[in-house]
Amino acid sequence: MTDLSPVLTIDGPSGAGKGTVSRIVAARLGWHYLDSGALYRAVGVAASWADLDVSDPAALVRCTFDTRVEFDDAGEAGLRVLVNGADATSELRLETTGALASAIAAIPEVRSALKERQRAFRRAPGLVADGRDMGTVIFPDAAYKVFLTASAEERAGRRHKQLMEKGVSVIFDDLLREIMARDARDAQRVVAPLRPAEDAVLIDTSGMGIEDVVQRVVGLLADRAPL
């Protein structure tokens, strides 16, 4: 039987703040949380561990089916991710893993293989789904849809600050180029290109604090229908 629990989709490009906002909103609502990007990154980590060639789609599709991904949700504190039983949380957030995940996500067979795995997260009392095609492909019937965005410069600045605070030395211009390249890949791929759902509420997070965005999203849910 299809689960009809309510779903809030939060889509947007890398660095728009959707991951942090989604986790906090899910925790405050008491809903489940899906980080769809973590699934693709997990496959990327598994492919890296297996030393697979990113230009070999067949091998990556097999890797997708063979990879076991488990989420340990820590609420607002974040998400612990196990790949085939091993903790891969820190590796998932590396820039190299993100680039690999973006390339893998462009393979139609990989997206198809992960589609039902993502939909299985939908259960009572509700789900906050964070990604790039949550409102357009995975949960097109979601009652609540949000698309977060921000300028490439703003997003590169946020990522630069995060990495510097972690002691990781990185050049801002390099990050900006990577973000712009990823935006182009995500927008131009044939299957599930990055775009807002027609019924999504667009929020430009440039210059906004996380709490401001969270309150805006929670307010949208309260305005549209009782939870």
UniProtKB/Swiss-Prot annotation:
Main location: cytoplasm
Keyword Lipid metabolism: no
Keyword Oxidoreductase: no
Database matches in SUPFAM superfamilies: P-loop containing nucleoside triphosphate hydrolases (SSF52540)
GO cellular component, one term: cytoplasm
InterPro entries: Cytidylate_kin, Cytidylate_kinase_dom, P-loop_NTPase
Binding, ATP: G12, P13, S14, G15, A16, G17, K18, G19, T20
A single GO BP: pyrimidine nucleotide metabolic process
Keyword annotations of the record: ATP-binding, Cytoplasm, Kinase, Nucleotide-binding, Transferase
Catalytic activity: CMP + ATP = CDP + ADP; dCMP + ATP = dCDP + ADP
A matching Pfam family: Cytidylate_kin
CDD domains: CMPK
GO molecular function: ATP binding; CMP kinase activity; dCMP kinase activity
Subcellular location: Cytoplasm
EC number(s) from the headed UniProt entry: 2.7.4.25
Top-level taxon of the source organism: Bacteria
Family named by the database record: Belongs to the cytidylate kinase family. Type 1 subfamily.
Protein name: Cytidylate kinase
Gene behind the chain: cmk
